[in-house]
Amino acid sequence: MTLRPMSERKPPRTKLCGSRRTALTLFGLIASLIACHAASSLRVTAFSRDGVLAWTNAPVPGICTIQAASAPNGPWTPRQNTFATNSTGALTVPMAGGNCFHRMQAVAVPPTPQGFTNLVYAYGILETIAGSGFGRLDDVSYWSPYFEGVPATWAALSRPHIAMADRAGNVYIADKNGHSVLRVAPDGTIHTHAGTHVGGFNGEGPAPATTLQLNYPNGLWTRSDGIVYVLDTDNGRVRRVNTNGIMTTLFLATSDGSAINVGRGLWVRADEALAYFCAGTKLRSWTPAGGLKTLASGFSELGDLYVEPGGDVIVGDRGANYAYRIHPNGSQTILAGNGTTNGGGDGFSALATGLYGVRSPWPVPTGGYLLLTHDGCQLWYLDTAGIIHLLLNGSELTHNGDGAFFYNPYVPKISEGRAVTMDYEGNLLICESDYGYIRRIRFQRIPPPE
């Protein structure tokens, strides 16, 4: 199912219900809250002096949007989105000085064509947040000391493989050929977070992370508090960088610390009692008591992974063109892909669709999944009914679309996809291109034309 480009249609809007209105004064700030969805049941239950807004009867799964205006008749500007995974919820609304009116709207995101439309138009601008695209050669580091502290889009990345954010808004990048983990701060500047930019091994730590060498780091996992775990592939280790910038070795990822065979993807539980990573044809697990084990094997070329709350592991097998669900007992089922590079497509069954080099899965709070393909250069959304939808198209060596609405499946905008994640605000982070870019799709509606 293909949607028309933004220029040809207006974003879907929910009906406003005047009966769902609450007005209160907070230190001279007048807030008008209008809330409803198709069932006319969404209701704001509280709006505190510090800007915490609470509601009930939201559609599930759904997306709630706060809009703001300087007058009760608008014009209204989308201010903030949040996914509704429960019928009740709350968020903090940024409070501005003077009179400001707010209203709340919600749309449902069921596994239907309209649900996909509602999801698409909750997102907005595509942008590059890191990478200048200077070079694309493998086994070459393009890092320069000049890049330290400059805007991240001025820095040349060196085959980055994943970008993941903490709750404070820092984005951490495993810059494989730069032998480092880079951090994009909330102000958009880039900094070395771990590694020396020279591949090798010079100790386990504890030591400042920027004094210890990494060797082709291919994966990372970031906790909400800013602790970062690194798959130090050619050093055969998983490293831990704490919030004070001190790096240690959490565990050896091979029996003797030799290089991991095609190491990709990493997940570490918050209590550090369980970890998973991919090693070529195997999904490996680690526990402090049991050490390393193979949970599942027989794959072609595993990529990234995500572990669900129930314990299932979602992985992409780039070589086999399948995404799998692997259960805690090691059994597996195909989640998406037909095992070839073509067939099916937008609006078809995910199991009938060729996902060329599917590499990276990530869950969406709707219950669906994002699936990013390396060779196909595409970002897909898999809904809970098993139907797949094309979110972002691409082609080899393409870098296009910055500053505009992200959705137009007819226009290539990305190239070789390596990882997709979602930050704590709902923005999508896409690590793509041999030239090395980190792209972001903002979870922010585009204001409708006045």
Give the role of each language-model region:
Residues 23-34:
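Bacterial N-terminal signal peptides
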Residues 36-118:
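Short, composition-biased motifs enriched in small/polar/acidic residues
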Residues 65, 179-183, 236-240, 281-284, ...:
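A short loop-to-beta-strand structural motif that recurs across blades of beta-propeller domains
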Residues 115-159, 189-216, 245-265, 289-303, ...:
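Gly/Pro-rich loop segments of beta-rich domains
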Residues 170-172, 227-229, 274-277, 312-314, ...:
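Conserved beta-propeller blade signature
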Residues 176, 233-234, 278-280, 318, ...:
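Short loop/turn segments immediately following the C-termini of beta-strands
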Residues 416-450:
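Blade-level signature of beta-propeller repeat domains, shared across WD40, Kelch, NHL, RCC1
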